[in-house]
Curated annotation (Swiss-Prot):
Chain sites annotated for binding beta-alanine: 61
UniProt-listed Enzyme Commission number(s): 6.3.2.1
InterPro entries associated with the record: Cyt_trans-like, Pantoate_ligase, Pantoate_ligase_C, Rossmann-like_a/b/a_fold
Active site: 37 (proton donor)
Organism: Agrobacterium fabrum (strain C58 / ATCC 33970)
Binding site for (R)-pantoate: 61, 153
Subunit structure: Homodimer.
Residues noted as binding ATP in the record, renumbered to the chain: 30-37, 147-150, 176, 184-187
One protein family per Pfam: Pantoate_ligase
Protein name from the UniProt record: Pantothenate synthetase
HAMAP family: PanC (MF_00158)
Length: 292
């Protein structure tokens, strides 16, 4: 594996792949890798000739009072994991390499990005789509791989790629979970032992939503209220977003029985926010069945 820290060196490496006629699979990350990231890497390796992973904690997607400074970082650990996974290029720039001057050009998907997580983290998704666009420009991947845990992010990136005619396929990969059902996340490391034990309320709430749907509950507001109450019964959990939405547009829906719906959760444990989601009413893929 080649560790690359500059844009110039990355461009040279990508040009060499292209001269050799190789397809490129790309996994953008913020580091502190877990099995979910490595699952994305494995998929990229299986479907492409060369695999590029980026590690960059992007300041544009953090708000003023968020966890940019304390976001977990361990490049040596991550490099070892990616070396073992057979990655070809690890691109790990610092902030001045990615943003040598204050950035004035922002890529925004405002309608999709202002809902759900975007409603409690204003500006977050504009930071995401801006850095993803820049990374796509640098890596020039044939395919890019994103975890479905960040469902809204995948939806925004897909729409951005469509609107801007970016020549990359966006591949969503089923959420990878811990043994007790909690979605794998770099932020899980923030949780105290008590909070970690309590955090299983999040996937359990998705199970409860699916149960209510199976029983024929049709009113989205009733589902939202029931799930918010279900989560709030855990003293350490504070639900910030509980929403039933259209899985393609993220718009509110009038009925649960008209078609598949997305149940999106954003739950705080102390200063740590965890997100999770599930599309219910749609036949699951074999990959999604295995992940759950």
């Amino acid at each position: 594996m080649r560790l690359v820290k500059t844009v110039a060196e990355l461009r040279d490496a990508i040009a060499a792949f292209r001269r050799a006629g190789k397809t490129i699979g790309f996994v953008p990350t913020m580091g502190f890798l877990h099995i979910g990231h490595l699952t994305l890497v494995a998929r990229a390796k299986a479907e492409n000739d060369a695999t590029v992973v980026s590690i960059f904690v992007n300041p544009l997607q953090f708000g003023a009072n968020e966890d940019l400074a304390r976001y977990p970082r361990d490049l040596a650990r991550d490099s070892a994991l990616l070396q073992e996974a057979g990655v070809d290029i690890l691109f790990a720039p610092d902030v001045t390499e990615m943003y040598p001057r204050p950035i004035q050009t922002v890529v925004d998907v405002p309608e999709l990005g202002s809902q759900l997580e975007g409603a409690v983290r204003p500006g977050h998704f504009a930071g995401v789509t801006t850095v993803v666009t820049k990374l796509f420009n640098l890596v020039q991947p044939d395919a890019a791989y994103f975890g479905e845990k960040d469902y809204q992010q995948v939806t925004l990136v897909r729409r951005m790629v469509e609107d801007l005619a970016q020549p990359v396929r966006v591949i969503p990969v089923a959420t990878v979970r811990e043994a007790d059902g909690l979605a794998c996340s770099s932020r899980n490391v923030y949780l105290s032992p008590e909070q970690r034990a309590a955090a299983v309320i999040v996937p359990h709430a998705l199970d409860e939503a699916e149960r209510l749907y199976a029983e024929g509950v049709d009113d989205p507001a009733a589902i939202e209220a029931a799930i918010e109450k279900f989560i709030a019964a855990e003293p350490l959990a504070s639900p910030e977003v509980v929403a039933v939405r259209d899985p393609d547009t993220l718009a509110p829906v009038a009925s649960l029985q008209a078609g598949p719906v997305l149940v999106a959760l954003f739950v705080r444990f102390g200063s740590t926010r965890l997100l999770d989601n599930r599309v219910i009413g749609r036949e699951k893929t074999a990959e999604q069945e295995a992940a759950q």
